[in-house]
Amino acid sequence: TQPQPEVPAYIFPLEDANAEVTNPYGWQAHPVTKQKSLHSGVDLAADYGTNVLAVADGTVLDCSYDAAYGYILTLEHENGIQTQYAHLSEFLVNAGAEVRQGQIIAKTGDSGWTTGPHLHLGVLIDGEAVDPLEALKSE
């Protein structure tokens, strides 16, 4: 029998794994308010209505609306890790649902304070925002 390929710990949240990072994690002037603040995630270029994928297995903690982030979905994963997907146009799962890595969970949009459609991906470890590109590197 053939050995099974190892499943990566995390996958990219968009089907286009080469999507451009249009706004990195870190302190910067907010593109809408112009005030300096921590950009607590990364913005990934995506057309309106692009499929958003769960980066890993988890439970949908919340699907809600926030004035700044617009429609935002939060997944809870193992080891105190949460992922947040913001500025969505549509939720495809409900709070409490179990999701699998790669499952389509939402559609990108431009809800909240944005300059256009994209996906804002945030990662929290034990409630603290960290750089998603570092935190979600597959080992």
Predicted feature locations:
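Active-site acidic-Proline motif in GNAT/NAT acetyltransferases
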Residues: 46, 90-91, 95
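Zn2+-dependent peptidoglycan hydrolase active-site motif and core
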Residues: 37-39, 54-92, 117-118
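Intrinsically disordered, low-complexity acidic/polar segments
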Residues: 30, 84, 130-132
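Short, well-structured beta-strand-loop connectors
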Residues: 51-61, 93-108
